[in-house]
Amino acid sequence: MSSELTRRNLLKAHAAGIAAATAGIALPAAAQPVPGGVSALQIKWSKAPCRFCGTGCGVMVGVKEGKVVATHGDMQAEVNRGLNCIKGYFLSKIMYGKDRLETPLLRKKNGVYAKDGEFEPVSWDEAFDVMAQQCKRVLKEKGPTAVGMFGSGQWTIFEGYAATKLMRAGFRSNNLDPNARHCMASAAYAFMRTFGMDEPMGCYDDFEHADAFVLWGSNMAEMHPILWTRIADRRLGFDHVRVAVLSTFTHRSMDLADIPMVFKPGTDLVILNYIANHIIKTGRVNEDFVRNHTKFVRGVTDIGYGLRPDDPVEVNAANSADPTKTEAIDFETFKEFVSEYTLEKTAAMTGVEAGFLEELAELYADPKRKVMSLWTMGFNQHVRGVWANQMVYNIHLLTGKISEPGNSPFSLTGQPSACGTAREVGTFAHRLPADMTVTNPEHRKHAEEIWRIPHGIIPEKPGYHAVQQDRMLHDGKLNFYWVQVNNNVQAGPNTKNETYLGYRNPENFIVVSDAYPTITAMSADLILPAAMWVEKEGAYGNAERRTHVWHQLVEASGEARSDLWQLVEFSKRFTTDEVWPAEILDANPAYRGKTLYEVLYKDSDVGKFPLSEINADYKNQESSDFGFYLQKGLFEEYAAFGRGHGHDLAPYDAYHEVRGMRWPVVDGKETLWRYREGYDPYVKPGEGVKFYGNKDGRAVIIAVPYEPPAESPDQEFDTWLVTGRVLEHWHSGSMTMRVPELYKAFPGARCFMNADDARKRGLNQGAEIRIVSRRGEIRSRVETRGRNRMPPGVIFVPWFDASQLINKVTLDATDPISKQTDFKKCAVKIEPVA
C-alpha cells in the first residue's frame, strides 16, 4: 500500500463503496472511504450504532492511539445509508469533556460518609463498601420495597438485563423503572392493549412505500432528522405523496407539510375520533378486515391524572382506581360513539380549519392511498397518551392499512435502546423480558426457571414507577436508590417539589452512575464514574426492532467502569442469606451462602461462555475482569425468553457481522412486517393477517372520548407551556453541551413565544423573563423569531439547558394507565424581569 491516500484511490474507494452498497455487499471497515489522507490509514475503523436517539443510525468509529478521533456515517447501515445528523457528526467528542468523572466520589465529613458532607475521591472498594452497607441497612430495616433503581433507555441490553436480574432475583424488588417511562410507556401500553405484543409491526422500509405521512406530535425534522430525509425524498420525488403535520405550534417539519395543522393542546383526541367517524360515514371501512381481524371495546372514562392520591383532581375522578377497565361492544356501538365527533364540532374544539381536517381524514379513508402515521412525545407525553396511541390504531384497523409495506402506524422512539432495553428486556416496574409481566404467576415461574432460582423469589406486585419513585423518595418510603444513565433531577417533572427533595432526604442514600457531574449526580451521596458508548461492548435495540451490537473500541477514562461492570461487581457483596427469605432457603439449601454474583451471573447460564470466544482484535474490560464472556452470556440467556414466542433473536455472534437485524429472527432471516402472511414466520399459510399477541388473533378497536388536560390556563396562569428538544442537543445536554460546535450552535435555552403575546406584555426579542407556574419558576429570554412559530397563548422551552431548569415549572401529571408524564401541557404566566 502506498504511503498516501491519493485522490484517485479515494475516488476508486468511494465508487467501490457505492457499488457494494447498491449490491448489498458489506465491505470491511478498512475498505470504506474516509477522508483524512495518510493519517486516515493509521485509524482503525469499526462499526457501532449512534449513541443518541432511537433511530439507530450506523456509524463508523475511528480509533487512533487509544482514542476515538473521528466518526462518519456507515454506508453499509440500512437505517441511515451513510448519513448522520449534526449530533452524529460530533460523536467523537462526547467522551472527552474536560470535566469527565474519573473516580468514585463520596460525600464525607471528618473522613466518613455524611449526607451533608462534601464530595471526596474514594476507591471503588470503599465506594462499594459504603454502598453495600447502606443497602443492607435499608433491606434489614424496611425490606425490599424500600430499595429501588432508576435506569434508562440508554442502557445497553446487557446492562438492563443484568439490572433486572439483580433487582428482581437478587434484592427481590420490582422498584426498577427506566427513564423510558417518561417517553415510551404510553406507546408500550397501547401496543399491549391493542395487539397483545409490544413494538411496531412495520419498519423503516415503509418510508419508501407510503403515499402519505401523518405526523402526530412529532417534529421529525429536528428529532429524527435522518428518517425525515427519507420522508422528504419520497415527498419531493413523487407528486402524489402528501405530508400532514399536526402540532400545538409551527415547527420545521411544517415546512414540508401539505396539510399543516396547529391544534389546541389536548384536542388531538377529538381529531382522532373525527377521522374514525369520517371513515365510517363515507363508507370506507374495510369490512372484511374489521370482521375477521378486530374486536371492539369501550374504555372506562374519568380516570384521573396520575397526581398524588390526595389531590382533589384524583379524589373527584370516578374511575382512577381502575383506569384500564374495558367492556366489549360491537361495531354499531362504536359507530354511534364516534358519530358526535363531526367536522363542525372538531373544527370548533381544536381551532383547526375544517378544510385541513377533511383533507387529513381523506388520506386515511382513501383505499388507494398507503398511509404511514408517525408519532413520538406529542402523543406519549400526554395524560391520555395510551388512548391517543390506541385511537390512531383504530384508524388503521378500520381501513385495514396495517402490517404491509407503506401502511404502517409507527411509534418513533426517543432513546437508542428504549425499545431494546427498557421494553424488550423489561426494565419497567411491572415487566419481565419478552412482554412478560411480574403480575402473571406463569411468567414469574418461567423467569425463575431460566434464571435457575427458586420459585417464589420474584415478587408479584409491580414496583414504583418513575414519578412514584420520586414521591416515595420524598416521603421517605424509598431509601436506597441507584440511578444509572439518566439525569432525572433535570429531566423529571415538578423537580423542585418532588425529585430534588427526595434525593436530599436525610433518610435516603442516593447513588448516581454517570460520566459527567450532572445536576442529578451532584444531588447524590455517592457518584460512580461510568464508561461511555464504545468504551464498552454493547447492544441497542432501535425503533424498528433492530438489534445492533458493537465491540469495545477504547478504554474508559480514568477509573470509570461500565454500568454493567458496576452492577455485576456490586452483586459480589451480597449473599443469598442476606437478601432471600429463610423459608425459601430452607427449602433450597444449595443456595445458602452463595453470593448474588455466583447465583445470578457466574454460575448461571451467563457464565458459560469462555474468554476465548471474544474477538481477539478487541478488548473487553468486563469479561476480562470476571473471567468469562459476560455480554454473550447475558444476551443468550435473555434471548431464551423470546425464542419461539415471536421475539426471536439471532445467535449473539451473528450480530457482530451485520448492521443489526429486526426481530423476530427465525432461521437467520429477519422480519420486516409482522402479523401478515408472507412476511411474518409466525403467520401460517392461509391465515392472512393474525395478531397473534392476542389469543383470538384479533386487534382491539377502542371507544374512548376526549377528556381535558389536568391543568389549563386561567386568568392568572394564562399561557400553555410545552417542553421538548432541539436539533443540536439531546435530552439534558450532558453530552452535547460539552461538544464545542453543538454548544456554539445553540448555547442556551430560549422561550419561544408568539410575537403579539410578547408585545402585549411589553417584551422585546431577547428580553429576560420569569416563567412561573404553581410549582416553581425559572428565568429565560424571549425568542419570537426562531425556528418555532408559536400561536397565541402557547410557549415552548427546551429542557437541555441546566441553567434553565424548566422542569421546576412542569406538572407531574401522568397518564393513569401508562404512568407516563405529560410534559406538553401545563399553565404558566410570563413576567418581565425588572
UniProtKB/Swiss-Prot annotation:
**Is the keyword Oxidoreductase assigned to this protein?**
yes
Please identify the protein, giving its name as recorded: Periplasmic nitrate reductase
Q: Which SMART domains match?
A: Molybdop_Fe4S4
What is the species listed in this Swiss-Prot or TrEMBL entry? Agrobacterium fabrum (strain C58 / ATCC 33970)
- Gene symbol here is napA
**InterPro entries named in the record:** Asp_de-COase-like_dom_sf, CT_Nitrate-R-NapA-like, MoPterin_dinucl-bd_dom, Mopterin_OxRdtase, Mopterin_OxRdtase_4Fe-4S_dom, MopterinOxRdtase_cofactor_BS, Periplasm_NO3_reductase_lsu, Prok_molybdopt-oxidoreductase
Per the UniProt record, one Pfam family is Molybdop_Fe4S4
* Quaternary state and interactors: Component of the periplasmic nitrate reductase NapAB complex composed of NapA and NapB.
At which positions is Mo-bis(molybdopterin guanine dinucleotide) bound?
87, 154, 179, 183, 216-223, 247-251, 266-268, 377, 381, 487, 513-514, 536, 563, 723-732, 807, 824
